[in-house]
Amino acid sequence: MTSRPLSPLAIFDLDGTLVDTAADLVSSLNHTIAAAGLAPVTYDDLTHLVGQGARVMIKRAFALRETELPEADIDPLYERFITHYRAEMPGESRPYPGIIETLDALSQAGITLAVCTNKTEILAVPLLEKLGLTRYFAAITCGDTFAFRKPDARHILGTIEKAGGDVQRSIMVGDSINDILAARNAAVPSIGVTFGYTDVPMVELEPDVVIDDFAALTPALFEKLVSKGAAAA
C-alpha cells in the first residue's frame, strides 16, 4: 500500500493572528477579576497578559495589580472566566481583514492549513466554529491538546503530524514571541504579523518575514520561505 504524500502546511496562531479577540478577552478577564475586587484591565494591558492561556492571563492580571492570588482561588476564577467567555462567544471577535481571502488562496494552491494555539480547546474550537473557520483546517491543536505548548517545538511538530504535513515544507504564522520561538525551536520558517498582541515590536522578535496585512501572505511567499528553509537544512 502506497503511503499518502505529506502536504505543504501553513500553521496559524489564533488570538491576534487569525482572529481579533481582544475585546472579548478583556471583557471576560475583567468580569473574572472583578470577583476579587481588582480594577479592570485595558486593551493596552492585554499585550502583557495573553499568550499562555486563561490561567496564566488571570495570574498576570493579579500581578499587574500587585495583588496576591491564593492558589485555592485559581480554579474558581478560571471557571468564572471560561463560563463568561463561552456564554458571550463569539462576542465582538472577528477574523482579521483579508484572512478569508488568504486561506482560500493558500488552499487553492494546494497548501494544507492548521491552527496551533495556546488557547484551551473548549474555547478555541467553538470560537472557530462560530466564525465559520473550522472548514479550512486539517488540524486544530490547542494549549491542552498535548502535554506541552508553544514555545515548545513539539506543539508545532505535533500539529504538523496531525495535519499530515511535511515538516520540511511548513511555516508558522503568529503575532507573539511564543509563535516565533516555537517555529525557531522546530526549525520551521516563521511569519510575524504586526497587528496582534505582542508587547515587543515584531521585527525585534526576528521572524523570517514580517507582514502588516494578510494580502502579503501569498502562495509565492509560502514557496519562497519553504525553499529557503530547505536550502538551510
UniProtKB/Swiss-Prot annotation:
The keyword Acetylation does not apply. GO terms for molecular function: metal ion binding; phosphoglycolate phosphatase activity. GO terms for biological process: carbohydrate metabolic process; DNA repair; glycolate biosynthetic process. Gene3D superfamilies: HAD superfamily/HAD-like (3.40.50.1000), Putative phosphatase, domain 2 (1.10.150.240). Pathway: Organic acid metabolism; glycolate biosynthesis; glycolate from 2-phosphoglycolate: step 1/1. Its EC number is 3.1.3.18. It catalyses: 2-phosphoglycolate + H2O = glycolate + phosphate. The active site is at D13 (nucleophile). Keywords: Carbohydrate metabolism, Hydrolase, Magnesium, Metal-binding. Its cofactor is Mg(2+). Disulfide bonds: none annotated. It comes from the Bacteria. GO terms for cellular component: cytosol. Pfam families: HAD_2 (PF13419). Mg(2+) binds at D13, D15, D175. This is Phosphoglycolate phosphatase.
